[in-house]
Regions:
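N-terminal glycine-rich cofactor-binding segment that shapes the pocket for flavin-like pterin cofactors
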Residues: 1-213
C-alpha cells in the first residue's frame, strides 16, 4: 500500500536516515519497489491518491507543506507502465477519483493500461473527500455524499458500456491479406443518457485482456 508522494501515511518518517521515500519522483524508486515486491511473492501493489490538499488545520496548508503530508503528490497511473515492464506477475491497483475524470477518456486510459500490463491493472473507485480538491476543480465545495455516489453509479454504467459493449469478441481480425483490421459489424456505437453523463460514440480501444479492470 503506497502513494505517489513522500511518506504516504507515515508522516514524518521521510526524515529518517534510512527512508528513501523522498525519491518518489524518480522512476527507479517505483521500478525497484515493484521488483522487490515481486521477489517477495506479493500479489499486487495498491496505490492511493487524493485530489486536493489538507488545509483545515489552522486554516492553512503550511504544516502540510513543511511535513510533506501527501503533498506534493504525483499521478499514480503514470507509474504503472514502467512497473509492469519491470515485472511479470505483480498486479497494480490504482486509485482514481471519478468525480473529476471524464469517463470517456478514463475508459481509454484504463484499457490502454490493461493492454500494456497484460491484464494486471485494477481500479480503486473513489469520489473524493476534500473541499480543497473540489474548489481546485472549479466547484464551490465538495458535493454532498449521496449525490457523489449517484454520480458514481452513472459514471460506472457508462464506462462499463464502453468496455463491455462497444467491441464484440472477435471484432479484431488483423487480417492483412483482406485489409481488415476490425469487423465494422462487431463494433458498436454506445449511447448513454444518464442523470450526470451523456455519451454518443465508440470506445477508442479494442478489447483488453480483462475488458473491465
Amino acid at each position: 500500500f503506497n502513494m505517489n508522494c513522500v511518506g504516504h501515511i507515515n508522516h514524518g518518517l521521510w526524515t529518517h536516515p534510512r527512508d528513501n521515500s523522498v525519491d518518489y519522483n524518480t522512476l527507479e524508486y517505483w521500478t525497484d519497489l515493484a521488483k522487490t515486491l515481486e521477489r517477495g511473492l506479493f500479489d499486487g501493489l495498491f496505490i492511493a491518491d487524493i485530489i486536493g490538499v489538507y488545509d483545515v488545520y489552522q486554516r492553512s496548508v503550511d504544516l502540510t507543506l513543511r511535513e510533506s503530508i501527501q503533498l506534493p503528490v504525483n499521478d499514480p497511473l503514470l507509474l504503472v507502465s514502467a512497473m509492469a515492464a519491470a515485472t511479470k506477475h505483480l498486479g497494480f491497483g490504482i486509485t482514481s477519483n471519478l468525480s473529476y475524470e471524464p469517463p470517456y477518456l478514463f475508459a481509454r486510459r484504463m484499457s490502454t493500461l490493461d493492454h500494456l500490463t497484460r491484464g494486471r491493472i485494477g481500479w480503486n473507485i473513489v469520489t473524493g473527500y476534500l473541499d480543497s480538491g473540489a474548489k481546485a476543480m472549479g466547484l464551490d465545495g465538495l458535493t454532498a455524499h449521496d449525490q457523489r455516489y449517484e454520480r458514481a453509479e452513472d459514471y460506472l454504467e457508462l464506462v462499463y458500456k464502453l468496455w463491455e459493449g462497444s467491441w464484440e469478441d472477435g471484432a479484431v481480425r488483423r487480417d492483412k491479406a483482406a485489409r481488415v483490421f476490425a469487423d465494422p459489424a462487431k463494433v458498436h456505437r454506445i449511447r448513454h443518457q444518464g442523470p450526470y453523463y451523456q455519451l454518443d460514440g465508440y470506445h477508442l480501444c479494442e478489447p483488453s485482456i480483462q475488458r473491465t479492470p
